[in-house]
Amino acid sequence: MTVSGRSSWQNGKTTNAMRAGKLATERDLESANYGSRSVEKLRHERAVGNLNKGRFLGMNKWSDEQLKHSMARYEDLAATRHNLFAVIMPSGCGKTSLARTYGMVDVDELVSRAEHDQYVEMRNEIVCGRGDWHDHNTLWFARLNQTLALLDYSVPVVIFVHTEETALEIGARPVACLTLETTAHEMNISGRGPKFREFSRESLRSCKPSNRVPNQYRFKSNKELEAFFLEVMNVSGLPVGAPFKYSTSIWNSSYSRDVPGWILRGERAGTQQVSINELRLLFEQGKIPKECVDYYVRASYVPTQFDFGVTMFEWSQALGQLPGCYNSRRDFDTLTDLMGVFPPHSPKEVTRSNVTLRTLCHTFDILSMPDAKEIASYHVGEGHTLVTNLLANWKGITQFTTVSHLVFPWFKVCERDWSDKMKTLHSLVRCSKFFMNTRITEKDRQALMYMDLLVGRGEYTVDEMAEVELRTDDTYNTKHLSYDPNRQVFTNQQYKKDFITSVEEAYVRLKIEPKPVNVDGFIDFYHRRASWLTKGGLVYNKLPPEMKKFGGQVFDAIYNTCREIQGRHNKKSLFEVYELAEVLQGANENNFNLTKTQIKYEVGKKDRTLLPGTLVHFVVFTYVLYLAEKQGQIGSVRLNTDSEVDIRYFDKKMCTGVFHVLYDWADFNEQHSAWEMGVVVDYLKHLIVAPRDYAVFVEAIVAGMYNMGLHDRDGNVHKIWRGLYSGWRGTTWINTVLNFCYVHIALQNVERLFGVRVVLYVDHGGDDIDLGLSEPAVMPWFLEVMDAMLFKANKWKQMFGTRSEFFRNTICDGRVYASPTRALASFVAGDWEGAGRATVKERVVSLLDQIAKLRRRGCSEELCQGLTIATISHWCRIKDGEDWLSLPAEIIHGHPDDGGLGVPDRDNNFWRLEEKVPEINEEWYKVVVPDYKASRDYVNVLARDVEKFSLVIEEREKLARKLSEDSYDIEKSVDHERWKHLLNFRTRVIAKELAVEPMEDSVVFEGFLEYEVEEGTEKKFDLASRYQEFVSYLSLNGRAITKEELLDLMSDGEVCLEAIEFQGDIYYARLVPEFIAYRATMFCKEAINKGVCDAISAQLFFRTICWMSASVFEHAI
């Protein structure tokens, strides 16, 4: 082994003193005049012709002027990159391998693959005499510095480069130049193509750094080179994993002296003997550096664990993709029509968006702010929603993070590449509590996730054949495997046995405690269709066009006018007009389970496809699930269980000592075989106490699993072999039950293979899993088993650690968090599906709920307050003739008790009005709908149900007509007609009251903290409130019945009317997550019902609980 060709080590051996004398010292690294000494050396070597012997990356082309420029660049950059250190290694010497292993930066990864290939081609052209090194270097170094400007240098960063000149140009201080002898080098490059081999050889020949570069050694093997590299890291005081892997001669100051030797030596890496959790604890105690934990995590089966594993290698690789995606900065006139400067891609970007650039300019004068103007200038000509989102996100969220200076350049990425690049960065942020080298809070982590969604919603052409290919197979059977303990191998036969057992386990409560359902058969169920049909789209159907439309009238009794209303049927209104036989004409076994592709209007423009089932399939599946969903909980999943806002789902995850496996499936829907889906549904007919015809409908659904097809836009039908449709009535049921079965079998296999049972709880629903374990060592075993069972997952998306994440809610350090960026992206884009049918009050409530969510999650108060005023003003407009007129401010900000909408003004005040807003009497309007068949049948069924309590429904036809009005999509039209009468309302504001003010009472709050919801409490209140919505149509013994009398009848006198009518103060409820507001409501209802307080006192209790919960718990969800 030679030392840069200048001297040799005797027999390849040296003393520690000799080695230390040749290694970089901290004093060398901190020497401020390294650059000036280096430039003189380079000038001298050029003068004697040393540089003229090589032709690699243009070293023989440097002039004195270029050298001066290079050193000037170094001195400028070294000041800001004082923690950037370079290891010089020619191509083919293993720099990428070392960078990946030890989590460092590889110069070749600082550009995208396409850019890298372009630079390689340029070099090949120059070597062949067709090109200029000066042009190449100017572009190359400038491009490297673009990426390096994005990195975090708060702690030392090591970069592997080809040459000393590269180090100078990027402001890095060389600590070593490590090369291989020819034989070892040739072995390394033997697998490369001819051009790359020649490039690597030229790189090695031309690597002749100045004498100022310390530690210039040539090695016989990769192992020797790696050993010396670690010694360089040790003597330089740079943190690195496995510092004593080859030698213990030089201590690394990043480690405590009492760290176990096996950790220092990097032993057991990749084995089950290593506890990543123990390494994490050592890091938290300050005994080992992050690089040590990263080293072991990266060697394990799971690339990220306990927030470790994401290194500067991944960060630099991801950030290296950004500069090539930057737009050029373009100036624009801020006073012109911004819709022209930033054009919307779709009319819905204008008609459905809650926020536009005009909103931001009018409310905040946002483009007068230099940072916002700069961001916008990089996106001239790009989508309106994207630019709106970027400005709102930066000013309301991102600029307040501790790493905002590092994130700001991201906002230059063009719209075309925004989503893809931000998804990659989202994964790095999600899997770590470090933003590169900076440890960030959970609040900041949440703010920096989901930035890919800022691109908004969009319309696109579905790739139908891609959906077919995802679901193409050669069998209906499952190909999943399970471990056979007898044969000691994973087999499909064992999996099928285990799957049947897991389904039985999932449905065990249905077998042990079956619950009868008040349905006599399908006909009885059909007569109740007004209660189970939804107002969703008609999905896939064979209806003629004329059957999909309806017409109605609205009579205005005040102005004596009649307005014709035309609309398209939804599922509910269709069955008001047509009977089942008419709707299902032409349905048969061949088209029973077909689908067509539809757009999913998701934020982030994910271009995912909605696959709805047929209308007849919907009806059949609804009957099957109508009975199943009234049974007990399914396994440990969130089916037939407590409300999603039950605090127990969150409370049990706030304790310490639990380790979480957050498994992320890849294309979960497509992994299910027809056999697995069929078994999940088929078992229902054996377990549910059901009418005789129930089994026929179950079997129809099961048979349909084996006869699926996709009807494309050209009229062709393509065979579907596997996977469920995302728009089935039973999609959630099948996904969730299969989630349970898959995990149940996997845990069984873990026990068979490793002999451990450490599961504390399993929480899963849909395709989400949160597996709570008592022993962290089992976590990677679970992933290994899932892989062995042939389930598909993205390893980089798996989260193993102490943090819980479920349904995009994160529980960490006793608090619940969710991403403000995700909520903002959805809010700005608006609802592209259902918002068009919302009434004014519904829209106002929805907007206030969404803005409250933004506020809780950490959006700035200024942004939230401004968006409240702007969006409410926008949507509280009524069309009168050709004009859109705003509702009077008195109505918008008027106190609800005075008939106002109750929107707090800029000062968070309600307005008390001298004259109340006139109540819009429903008798002013009469809506004539085409028919009300479903509602009429439902009223007849209700009549039979209430007869059990000696109650009679009076005026059945009137009630049926009234119920049917809700089936048609006419609310908005009727609502606007009503509000038009109030456009000219004016009155004097006599006082203003704070919507929310501090409320504190430690006694009440302590009582709330000790409160436990008794089993059956919610059910008790639900049963007591039965039929209250029909009370005005009910009679008992020939006379009208009161609310109190009906309540006594339904609850046997156990519940009082004040308790079931108590709702809490919505303005205080918005201060806290739903699970706290729900619990506070139940607490107050119980207090009223038990006579502890009246409704007025309960309202004070509720406000106090919400106010104190917000300040004490600080949940950000």
From Swiss-Prot:
What EC class is this? transferase
Annotated GO molecular function terms are: hydrolase activity; nucleotide binding; RNA binding; RNA-directed RNA polymerase activity
Task: Enumerate the InterPro entries for this protein.
Answer: DNA/RNA_pol_sf (IPR043502), RNA-dir_pol_luteovirus (IPR001795)
User: Which branch of life, at top level?
Assistant: Viruses
Q: Does the keyword Nucleus apply?
A: no
Q: Name the Enzyme Commission number(s) assigned to this protein.
A: 2.7.7.48
Stretches the record annotates as Disordered: 1-23
**Pfam families for the chain:** RdRP_4
Does the record's keyword annotation contain Nucleotide-binding? yes
Give me the reactions it catalyses.
RNA(n) + a ribonucleoside 5'-triphosphate = RNA(n+1) + diphosphate
Q: Tell me which UniProt keywords the record has, alphabetically.
A: Hydrolase, Nucleotide-binding, Nucleotidyltransferase, RNA-directed RNA polymerase, Transferase
Which GO BP terms sit in this record? DNA-templated transcription
UniProt-recorded name of the protein: RNA-directed RNA polymerase
Q: Organism, per UniProt?
A: Penicillium chrysogenum virus (isolate Caston/2003) (PcV)
- Chain's gene name: p1
